[in-house]
């Protein structure tokens, strides 16, 4: 439940919390869940009177270090996200918009398959980037040092003098 979710995030448990978010409770034959959008309508044409709970925003607010949202119909985006989340050390959330074609698929539902497919817009190309060894630099105040990054590029770091006074 939502209480366990909150505590898992804030305790920074080392886990992937994968949500198949369809905005409905299938066992109750289409009752709106806490993640149902207020503008979304069920099979009977009724809207939920409540604001939806945005699990991704909640996870960020509670301090989760890895938060993503994807669509179950977009394998090219979802697979790299899952790989990255599994490798992440700490709490990772992926909120997967996953339409319930049985109880929450009318045209007015914002979680219907057609609606999500038509409004699915990737914000960026998603790919898995494997972890690398940490790069550190130890240098004196008032000096500059060049640091070579993993891709071979060089970054110049300058440390202000100890007596610097803006």
Model-derived features with residue positions:
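Thiamine diphosphate
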Residues: 1-26, 77-80
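Short acidic, glycine/serine/threonine-rich loops at helix termini
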Residues: 1-4, 27-32, 104-109
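Short, hinge-like loop/turn segments at secondary-structure boundaries
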Residues: 8, 33-37, 85, 110-113
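Residues forming the flavin
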Residues: 15, 31, 47
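Conserved thiamine diphosphate
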Residues: 34-85
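ATP/pyrophosphate-binding catalytic subdomain of soluble kinases
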Residues: 64-119
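Flexible, low-complexity linker and terminal segments
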Residues: 100-166
């Amino acid at each position: 439940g939502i209480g366990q979710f909150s505590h898992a995030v804030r305790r920074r448990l080392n886990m992937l919390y994968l949500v198949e978010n369809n905005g409905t409770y299938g066992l109750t034959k289409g009752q709106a869940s806490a993640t149902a959008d207020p503008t979304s309508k069920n099979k009977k044409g009724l809207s939920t009177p409540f604001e939806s709970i945005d699990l991704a925003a909640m996870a960020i607010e509670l301090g989760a270090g890895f938060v993503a949202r994807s669509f179950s119909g977009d394998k090219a985006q979802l697979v790299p996200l899952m790989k990255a989340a599994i490798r992440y050390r700490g709490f990772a959330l992926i909120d997967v918009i996953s339409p319930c074609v049985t109880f929450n698929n009318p045209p007015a539902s914002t979680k219907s398959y057609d609606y999500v497919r038509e409004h699915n817009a990737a914000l960026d190309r998603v790919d898995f980037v494997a972890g690398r060894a940490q790069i550190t630099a130890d240098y004196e105040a008032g000096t500059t040092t060049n640091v070579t990054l993993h891709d071979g590029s060089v970054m110049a770091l300058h440390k202000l003098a100890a007596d610097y006074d803006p």
